[in-house]
Amino acid sequence: MKLAYFSSLLPLALAAPASVVDPREPKEDITDRYLFSTPLPTFLEYREKENPDSLDWTSDGCTHASNNPFGFPFEPACQRHDFGYRNYQAQTRFESDSRYRIDLNFYNDMIFQCTDVSALRSCHGLADVYYAGVRMFGGFAKRDEMGAVVASATDPKESAEDLIAVYYTALQEYHQAVKADQADGLLPRL
């Protein structure tokens, strides 16, 4: 009898929304929970349902990122990164410390996305390049009169020269990883 009763509740449980948001919960708390405490696959379910609709779910994906010729699955990480930047900006709390946390979460999401990739060295290498790129250009980039990015107004502890050096080192290491993965037959030669 009990089994039949609980079995009849199963369709209702499966049809329930992925997340029930208390309408009294501040947007800032929801944003932080979705960014820093929610597994990426669960975040993507919330994003698909735009739950709650009071948050900014828009994303341009990885459009400003470096080339991804092997199609590493970074799009979900880029979507959550955009969610973080856009909502923190809308909530007027986008500053160097929060930006660092959002960027670090982006890096961790990319590493998670590499889990099922056979060319793990190259996937991790490109994650390093993307992370260095957002640290250098993300959020606070300054532009000259022609619209070109000239520097990044970042945390004073991160000089533009250091960020550029980290970016180019990551790029070099990525190219080395690609060559190694190609030699091992894990990536095609382009």
UniProtKB/Swiss-Prot annotation:
EC number: 3.1.1.4
Temperature dependence of activity: Optimum temperature is 35 degrees Celsius.
Phenotype of the disrupted gene, per the record: Decreases the ability to penetrate the host cuticle and impairs the repression of host immunity genes.
Cofactor(s) it depends on: Ca(2+)
GO biological process, one term: arachidonate secretion
GO CC annotations, alphabetized: extracellular region; lipid droplet
Cell compartments where the protein resides: Lipid droplet; Secreted
pH dependence: Optimum pH is 7.0-11.0.
One MF term in the entry's GO annotations: metal ion binding
Induction, per UniProt: Expression is dramatically induced in the presence of insect hemolymph as well as by lipids. In addition, is also up-regulated in cultures containing insect cuticle and under conditions of nutrient starvation.
Secretion signal span: 1-15
Cofactor, how bound (note): Binds 1 Ca(2+) ion per subunit.
Active site: H81
Catalytic reaction equation(s): a 1,2-diacyl-sn-glycero-3-phosphocholine + H2O = a 1-acyl-sn-glycero-3-phosphocholine + a fatty acid + H(+)
Residues annotated to bind Ca(2+): A65, D82
Keywords: Calcium, Disulfide bond, Hydrolase, Lipid degradation, Lipid droplet, Lipid metabolism, Metal-binding, Secreted, Signal, Virulence
Protein's recorded name: Secretory phospholipase A2
Gene for this chain: PLA2
